């Protein structure tokens, strides 16, 4: 078993009372590496722990096992580190894989990264791309509009050694403005939590609860509706994200999901397929005959949840149902 994983098990076994002084002596890179290991441990069987650290068996849970996950890691860090430092660490370990910011960016899907960078200054884009793996930088450049891509290329060609302070400033901005949103770690209020719950209701249950809530508390009902991400909101995906989503979903499920969809939603999905694939899907849908509303709701919920999972991994970008209010997962 590798050293970092052994250290993660040790820190979990030490717990809050005995691990505090050790945490305070670690630098940021060590804390990030150790936190990442802790957050991905899952269940550590008692035999493994006993073989490594017999003296810590008495401090383990009643089941004789340790459970390492994001929440347990965050709670432990909060005991010993300032909130801002904990938030930064958790943002990074919940985000794309990589030992540092630049490795993480190289693991973010190029369309997602390009959509973010194209709103930055060309000089900033040049600095960022100069730090990425060449093959990833090339794919990002290929997505930019031609005039922007050419501007960035010229700036990269003329770029001299970038001061450490500039790199650190860019890295800080990426961490706070991009990675923190990408990893979806910001604190959510009760309306956001409830919107997620409503997203998982079937259509009839959702309508019933929303209607009742509107009668009791219209303001809260409107806030929840504004925060919900629904099947119809998938039409706001960019073409690359839509195609990524469809590559990851069973075509039969997509056909069922589109059975009760409005014309705009259907045209959006058909428009992001080849003509042949769209015709085949339309034929399959026609051959299905009547489909239970419950099955349609389940298929649509599957697509929405899949989209959220892909967005959390940095493979696609989602937007909320209000056109002027973008949300990056």
Swiss-Prot record:
It comes from Bradyrhizobium diazoefficiens (strain JCM 10833 / BCRC 13528 / IAM 13628 / NBRC 14792 / USDA 110). One of its GO terms (molecular function) is cytoskeletal motor activity. InterPro entries: Flg_Motor_Flig, Flg_Motor_Flig_C, FliG_a-hlx, FliG_M, FliG_N. The keyword Membrane applies. PANTHER family: FLAGELLAR MOTOR SWITCH PROTEIN FLIG. Gene3D superfamilies: 1.10.220.30. GO terms for biological process: bacterial-type flagellum-dependent cell motility; chemotaxis. It is found in: Cell inner membrane; Bacterial flagellum basal body. FliG is one of three proteins (FliG, FliN, FliM) that forms the rotor-mounted switch complex (C ring), located at the base of the basal body. This complex interacts with the CheY and CheZ chemotaxis proteins, in addition to contacting components of the motor that determine the direction of flagellar rotation. Keywords: Bacterial flagellum, Cell inner membrane, Cell membrane, Chemotaxis, Flagellar rotation, Membrane. Its main location: membrane. Pfam families: FliG_C, FliG_M, FliG_N. GO terms for cellular component: bacterial-type flagellum basal body; plasma membrane. Belongs to the FliG family. The keyword Metal-binding does not apply. It is a peripheral membrane protein. This is Flagellar motor switch protein FliG.
């Amino acid at each position: 078993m590798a050293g970092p994983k052994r250290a993660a098990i040790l820190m979990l076994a030490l717990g809050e009372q005995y691990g505090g002084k050790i945490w305070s002596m670690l630098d940021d890179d060590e804390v990030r590496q150790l936190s990442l290991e802790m957050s991905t441990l899952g269940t550590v069987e008692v035999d493994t722990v006993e073989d490594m650290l017999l003296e810590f068996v008495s401090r383990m849970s009643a089941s004789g096992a340790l459970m390492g996950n994001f929440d347990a890691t965050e709670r432990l860090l909060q005991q010993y580190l300032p909130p801002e430092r904990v938030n930064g660490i958790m943002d990074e370990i919940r985000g794309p894989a990589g030992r540092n910011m630049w490795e993480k960016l190289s693991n973010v899907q190029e369309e997602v990264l390009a959509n973010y960078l194209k709103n930055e200054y060309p000089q900033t884009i040049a600095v960022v791309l100069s730090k990425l793996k060449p093959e990833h930088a090339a794919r990002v450049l290929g997505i930019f509009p031609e005039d922007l891509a050419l501007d960035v290329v010229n700036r990269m060609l003329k770029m001299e050694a970038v001061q450490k302070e500039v790199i650190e400033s860019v890295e800080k901005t990426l961490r706070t403005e991009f990675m923190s949103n990408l990893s979806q770690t910001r604190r959510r209020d009760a309306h956001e939590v409830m919107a997620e719950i409503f997203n998982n209701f079937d259509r009839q249950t959702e309508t019933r609860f929303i209607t009742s809530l509107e009668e009791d508390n219209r303001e809260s009902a409107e806030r929840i509706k504004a925060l919900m991400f629904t099947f119809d909101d998938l039409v706001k995906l960019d073409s690359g994200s839509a195609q990524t989503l469809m590559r990851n979903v069973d075509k039969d499920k997509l056909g069922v999901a589109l059975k009760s969809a409005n014309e705009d939603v259907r045209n959006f999905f058909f428009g992001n397929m080849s003509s042949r694939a769209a015709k085949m899907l339309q034929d399959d849908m026609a051959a299905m005959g009547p489909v239970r509303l419950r099955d349609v709701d389940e298929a649509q919920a599957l697509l929405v949840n899949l989209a959220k999972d892909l967005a959390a991994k940095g493979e696609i970008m989602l937007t909320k149902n209000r056109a002027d209010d973008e949300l990056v997962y």
